[in-house]
Amino acid sequence: MVTEPSKVLDYKFLIGGRNYNMDLGKAKYISENTDFVKWKELSSRAKINLNLVHELHANTYATSTARIFELSALRCCIVSSPYQGLERWFEPKKEILIANSTEEVIEIYQTLMEDSELRLKIGLAAEKRVKKDHTARNRVQQVIDIIRKCQNKL
């Protein structure tokens, strides 16, 4: 989602987070230790934010880091690598875009970079969804519901 597209597209790619000592193409590695305030600023300014999923999350149904929810709350337009259960949280093609191949991700990047209204539309839809379905209150209620369900089985 980064290496090859950054070599063929004339866009600025910035990567933050852990440095996995991999070929980043022409992407610039920022830092592993970007504080949250700076991260919010960079994410909000970016035209496209990537959700790069580790193999563990990709292959374990409905697992994720908080990052996808944080980006959505910031109204970011997100392109994600695929993983099992993602559609449980966000509607693909409406609230998030999923790239399954290098060719597909290049096409998605080109489309988004040429269409600011589409980026805004996706970001707004993701923000609306996260504020509706993915708040701390929602998670607490889910835990309560699970506990009640377990108690009823006893």
What are the residue ranges of the model-derived segments?
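Conserved acidic donor-binding segment of nucleotide-sugar-dependent glycosyltransferases
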Residues: 96-102, 111-116
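Short acidic active-site motifs
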Residues: 37-38, 104-107
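Non-transmembrane alpha-helical segments in soluble domains
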Residues: 2-6, 109-110, 127, 144
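A charged, aromatic-enriched C-terminal amphipathic alpha-helix characteristic of glycosyltransferases
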Residues: 113-145
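Generic C-terminal helix-cap and adjacent flexible tail
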Residues: 148-154
